[in-house]
Amino acid sequence: MKPGRKSLPKKNRASNITEKMPTTSTEAQSSSSKNQDRCRSFSQELGVDDEPEEQQAPVATPKQTKKAQKTAKTTEEVKSPRKSARKSELKKPEPEEKAKEPRKSASKRKSSSLMNKDEPSTSTEAPSADVPGTSEASDEASEIQEAPENPNSALAIKKRLMGGGESSKSAPTKNPPKARKSNVKKPEKEAEALAPPEPPAEPQEAAETPAPEPLVPEKKPKIEDAPTTSSPKKSTPTSAPPTRASARVSKPNRLYADGSFNTEILGRTRITEQNPVKEAQAKESTPELADLPLPAGRRKSTAAPRAPPAPKPIPVINGVLRGYIPSVKVPLAEYEVDGEIINLNEGVNETMDTILAKVCEDGVEKHEDIDPKVVKAKKLAKIDYTKRLKLQVKKLDIQMRIKIPSTPEELGKRKRQAPKTDDFYWSAQSRTKLKGSSKEREETPAFDEESPIGGDEKRQQKARESISHLFDAEMDASIKEAKKYSVSFDKYIKPKITGALKHAKIKLMSRKRQSAEPDDFYYHELLVDQVSPSNSNVENVDVDVDIEETDDKVDPTEFEISEEGVIGIRDEAVDMAEQIALVIPRPTKHDGSPMSMDEIQMRAMEHVESRTKCLDGSLEIVLNQLGHEMAPPTRGVEEQGCQWHTVTSANAQALKNLYTIANNCTEDAITWTHQFMIENLEVHMLASYLSILKYAKRLNSSRFGYVISSTDQLDPEWTQVTSLLKSFVYKRHTEPGTEVLNNTIPYHRMTDTVFLLVPPTLTFGDHQRAPPRHHARIFRWLQSIGHQDSEFISFDEDIDATCSVAEYLSDVIVERICDKVRQKNKYRPNCNVVLVGYGASTYLIHRAANLVEGISAIISIGFPVMTSLGRRGTADDEILLTYCPTLFIVGAEGRRFNNEAITELRTSMISPSGLVVVGHSNDMILVPTSMLLRLGISQTVVFRMVLEKILDFLNLEPVRQQEFADLVPIELNNVFDLDSALLKSDKALSGLAFASSTHSASSSAAPSPVGASGRRATVTGAGSEDIAKRRKESIILSQQIAAPSISGPPPPAPSPRTEDRFLAFQNLVASTITTGDDMPRRASMGASPRVIERGDFRDHRPPPPPPLPILQNPVATPMSQQPPLPSPAPPPPRGPVDPASISLI
């Protein structure tokens, strides 16, 4: 390798190729002279002759900005002194070369120097003859110029990039490629050896350069363009524009200066290749910011940063921090020290306030609710939030409504004058005619709003209205058709009724009237035995199925006995058991055969008694489930699904009762039993256990979730098994055999009824997500059938969780029910409000019915008529005064059901009531498992029949067609509200003081009697004329009783013990007693009397004996002079009597 070639810097040898990239002809012509000179300098370095015409025009380099110039200057100042010396040495032949070429302007020299400064390496000037190795480099250049090659060709660039220059030096060819740039930086010693000696005159030349800026310590002289030989200007050959003009062409040394290069020059896809060696070199050569000389205006100060200002202390005003409400502090007494009295409250409390605020953060957050402004703001925020929710609901209602476009009815342009939307159907000639006619019509004046409407206009308006009405009717019909449920309940239940009669001799339900009394409002029985008729149901003798006949025939597949149906139910459980068996193999004997159940139980006997006892109970439940699943099928596929669901639910309830935690030993036994059964049970038994576990998870989610997760962290195998169990158990299951049942629910069929559902388990707070109970299914069905505002009644958030008094919680929920009823009547005045209770909550809804108005009906499911204090429906029971129709649904086998008590309750109520008796069920309307297996149905089917009876009761005309004015609680008199003037009388406490004064008898109307229960009857049914007539009769009767007879003993005084005078005594007492609160109320009741429809409070005493004749002396008193015998007392009234007056009879 020649020394001259080696001494030349590598970056000068790898000059900017991007400057030689072809551009458009306009650029080449605009800067031809400048680019030609630059091209000559570059070609000398590369050893390429630029004389041939095939050379493409170089790319014009854009001018640099001042910012780029400063950057280049700053970068050059950091370079080594040897490089600067070398630059000055290379600068010596500059005047000779300048004499050959035309003189350049100052601006061109400035631009060329800026472009050369932008390059990362030194100038590309050829070395002079004084420097050793210069002659050899010129000889080499002359050899290379003999066979020129286009340096911008793809082959030359590729050779330079791939390092073909080193191989060409040993064997020179026509076009020796350029040496590849070395990625490794040379050491300093090698660079010093190869560099030429420094001349002594370098500092003087450097001093002759223009003075740099005052703040910059050293500045290099401007480096002019490289010397080139003058050559005549050649016309640039026109060539096709390049396929792609990259944005990187404008940057001179972008290809080689960076650590990445653009290979798109070679015609490849654009890829950016990273060179880690060059990146490391760039990091090493890049000076630190602290070493760079910066100008005075932009130099950063090296002083330490200022500390942040200290936060301002919180002001303490009168011992209390601002915005701080202090906690309660005990007042401290003053004490004396050395004759000086010290007040501790001022010093200690101030210090405590500051400590609490800074350390404990007490006061501001914990006591914000004490501030009345904060409390008021919170209430206002809740009110605003409620209003926003209501507005949002209204907005959604408006959006969900079907908007029917209708024609406008305003006067003006008619529809035929509107622009045509189907112009493309018309020809060009017709279209022009329409446009011309429309223009003429637009010029005509429109109708005046005050002008009378013509006959044609009226007819058109009527036509538009009729069209819109027809459209509305069609839309309503389509909506109703879409809302229809797909399967009728009669079609679904008919085969089940037939199967129950065939297998169990039990009639599930009937549509016919089942009451023996014609006056009974509504009475039905479900699941009735057909063996012997009962007294209350005369139609049980009929064996015919009275469900409405349908044209569709019963599907014969429902009664097909198929073993595949039973196997298909537990397929999922069997698959999961097989997956668990793959992870944890089943135990085997020494010979490899599987262990029997007896041997597995013998292994369990080694453990403590609590574990073995829990295992025995669990195995008994699993064997019961397995026995039912392995039994041969005897019913249809749907009945098999119902039976499997019934058995699995019962076994899940038993497992839930067994896995109830009592103490630490029991908890350990439960988790060990679960782990033992998962690890040792066979696949078919494990599938049965998994089915039970899945159903039990719904009964007590938290408990069984803990049991399943107890094996999670034992080892990796058990972790995998636990994840499999969770994926199976947590998956929501559907009850088999009831897929068609869900299609019989008439969703949104009673949109004019709002159901308020009061569950028997009332929860609040974190316990809102209680596990589903037996009542949840009926309540969800009713909520989906009724109006969208139907909801469950629960406790408010304001309830104190520590309070457990039943009376207090009952009053709270009753008040909540009343508030909901008032709210629904206010916002939904056209809807009927129906209260639904289940179990104990039925008492609460009946209590609320006596306090609030607007309840259309009450549904009492599982009403307990027998209580610990006696039966319901006695004379002083408020349930008798229920003003709305009531439906009682009771279980025939319940402990709190009594047929006579419920019959007397219904008869004594003043409003109509219905009764549905579910046979073979308990108080919660739950049918035993054995009975469900006989019938081939599940508990869900029983609830569906109960729902059908509820809908039948609500669709009765007396229930649907009630006036809102009649739905008002009956008002009772207050017996303690007496007239104070009555107590000031002297004869107030005398026996017949009121009877002796005719003035007091005629001064006021006769009130109703007051009973021992504290009520006074208010229903009289008499007008003002009847009151005056009865008052007159009572005065005459009292005068006859008070006047002594002429002869004979006087008649006995009236008393309640005299049976023949009982009615007269009652009339006398009723006509003489007066109170201050009776006149206005009785006067108002007389104008619009309220008729009592039903009642059973009759006189249950035996009929009175006939009156005995009065024995007198016939001689002393002739027959003509004897007073006439009083007429016999009329029979006791058989009609309805007010319940409040029953205590006086």
From Swiss-Prot:
Species of provenance: Caenorhabditis elegans
Top-level taxon: Eukaryota
Biased composition (Pro residues): 1121-1136
Pfam families listed in its UniProt record: KANSL3_1st (PF23154)
Cellular component GO terms held in the UniProt record: NSL complex
Stated name of the protein: Protein sumv-2
Extent of Basic and acidic residues compositional bias: 73-104, 216-225, 455-464, 1091-1102
InterPro entries associated with the record: KANSL3_1st, NSL3/Tex30
GO biological process: positive regulation of transcription by RNA polymerase II
Keyword check for Acyltransferase: no
Sequence ranges of Basic residues compositional bias: 1-13
